[in-house]
A protein has these predicted regions:
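Basic, amphipathic alpha-helical hairpins
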Residues: 1-8, 19-30, 44-57, 76-80, ...
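Short, Lys/Arg-enriched anionic-surface-contact patches
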Residues: 31-39, 82-88
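Pre-recognition alpha-helix immediately N-terminal to the DNA-recognition helix
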Residues: 38-46, 88, 92-95
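Short coil turns linking two alpha-helices in DNA-binding domains
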Residues: 64, 68-69, 116-117
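Base-recognition residues in the alpha-helical recognition helix of bacterial helix-turn-helix
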Residues: 71-74, 120-123
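…primarily DNA-binding HTH/wHTH and HhH modules…
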Residues: 123-144
Length: 144
């Protein structure tokens, strides 16, 4: 059992390292594309300010920017390669990682990052990171 636990912890560590490398490689390309249009920066600022509200969505961003949702979608697809909704979800997940690392419960994390349903949050987190948020949280608890 101890061997299984040690091997699974090592596998998770390798997976997290690979995810970090992937993110580091992808980030400069995304950063370069979003610098081209100040509207992207405005939208990202709105996301950073409102991601924690569950009712916050692409429609909210479009309304605050006084553009149609279609225009906002085209802008994001062209400059970032993601829809505004995808970017918002990614942003929420990244913020949730930080809260889990600080020891916040899965339910508190989900609600703090704009997910109304902690079970939905867990499914999305697991699909994105390959492990449930509870395991991710425990992994950082063991390190500290």
């Amino acid at each position: 059992m101890e061997l299984y636990r040690r091997n699974s912890q090592e596998a998770v560590g390798v997976l997290l390292a690979l995810l970090g490398v992937y993110q580091d490689l992808a980030e400069p390309q995304r950063e370069e594309r979003k610098k081209e249009d100040p509207r992207i920066m405005e939208a990202m600022g709105l996301i950073a300010a409102g991601y924690h509200r569950s009712e916050f969505c692409a429609e909210t961003i479009a309304r605050k920017m006084a553009v149609s949702r279609t225009t906002l979608n085209r802008l994001f697809q062209k400059k970032i390669g993601w829809s505004p909704g995808q970017y918002l979800l990614e942003y929420r997940l990244q913020q949730s990682e930080k809260l889990l690392q600080m020891g916040m419960t899965v339910k508190q994390t989900a609600l703090s990052c704009g997910f109304e349903d902690p079970f939905y949050y867990s499914r999305v987190f697991r699909k994105h990171y390959g492990m449930p948020p509870s395991d991710y949280r425990l992994q950082f608890a063991e390190i500290q």
